[in-house]
Regions:
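Short hydrophobic alpha-helices and adjacent helix-cap/hinge residues
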Residues: 2-272
Length: 272
């Protein structure tokens, strides 16, 4: 990880925890010394590098501030399960666990957790402040966030600078193949990329991946013209339901394809 990536992560987590502490103090009163209870709701499963970084970062920041907080951590595991029946069961579990002892603040990471909270908040976590992180396309939530006691840190990635670097390293590039899965996060990333390239002043042909299996994706990449590059965004679940961690995905694509691959997140680097 570069020093710039580390600094950005530190700033993001510090900002996130500062928002949490501020909201908790406003919500409970500065004179109340009772330890605050914080629920951390993750969109994905324990073991994903991004999820582990977020959770450990939250714990580390609260340890560093010396704030006396009780932290509960939950995982939606939405890369593996995301149907309505599953979410209804989660609702019942969380209602059982938190109805009598609700948290004072909720931190949610990534889009699926925020969507879950917006859907069930009125009946599950009424009026509890929510702080989000890792949201890819904040424009999707404009109506829901207005006057909602929900705030947070938006995830931004510099697509144009990544493409500029790619163009310098592969100056003959004419085609960019953008890889995303068809999950909520994947399609939010598509919207972000399309918005970013509107202002990109280099003439490139952008191709967006289909709803493919991993083998179909490899075949798509290998069929690209030689003057192409891959912009790897998020591909954690393929058309057949197979789930991929970041290391496994980048290793597979680098070994089985012959097109240069670029990414906007540091956890892809060094794995292929």
């Amino acid at each position: 990880m570069s020093i710039y990536a580390r600094l950005l992560k530190l700033i993001t987590l510090s900002t996130l925890c500062s928002l949490i502490i501020l909201l908790a103090n406003i919500n409970m009163g500065y004179c109340n010394k009772t330890p605050k209870t914080i629920l951390v709701l993750n969109s994905y499963h324990y073991g994903m590098q991004w999820v582990n970084n977020v959770v450990s970062g939250i714990y580390n920041e609260f340890d560093a501030t010396g704030d006396d907080a009780i932290i509960h951590t939950e995982y939606l595991d939405s890369k593996n399960y995301s149907d309505d029946n599953y979410y209804n069961m989660l609702y019942n579990v969380y209602q059982y666990k938190y109805q009598q002892s609700p948290p004072d603040i909720i931190i949610c990471s990534d889009d699926n957790a925020l969507r879950f909270l917006i859907k069930y908040r009125n009946s599950l976590f009424t009026n509890i402040p929510i702080v989000f992180c890792g949201i890819n396309n904040i424009d999707s939530y404009k109506n829901e966030l207005e006057n909602s006691n929900i705030t947070g840190v938006v995830e931004n990635f510099d697509i144009n600078s990544t493409l500029m670097i790619a163009k310098k390293m592969q100056p003959t590039t004419k085609h960019v193949f953008v890889v995303n899965d068809f999950s909520i996060t994947g399609q939010e990333n598509v919207a972000v990329v399309k918005k970013a390239i509107k202002n990109f002043n280099i003439n490139l042909d952008f191709i967006f991946s289909k709803n493919s299996s991993i083998n179909e994706l490899v075949a798509e990449i290998n069929s690209l013209p030689s003057d192409s590059i891959v912009l790897l965004m998020s591909f954690n679940k393929d058309r057949l339901g197979e789930v991929f961690g970041y290391r496994r995905l980048s290793n597979k694509l680098s070994k089985e394809t012959n097109i240069p691959i670029y990414g906007v997140w540091d956890f892809y680097v060094g794995n292929g």
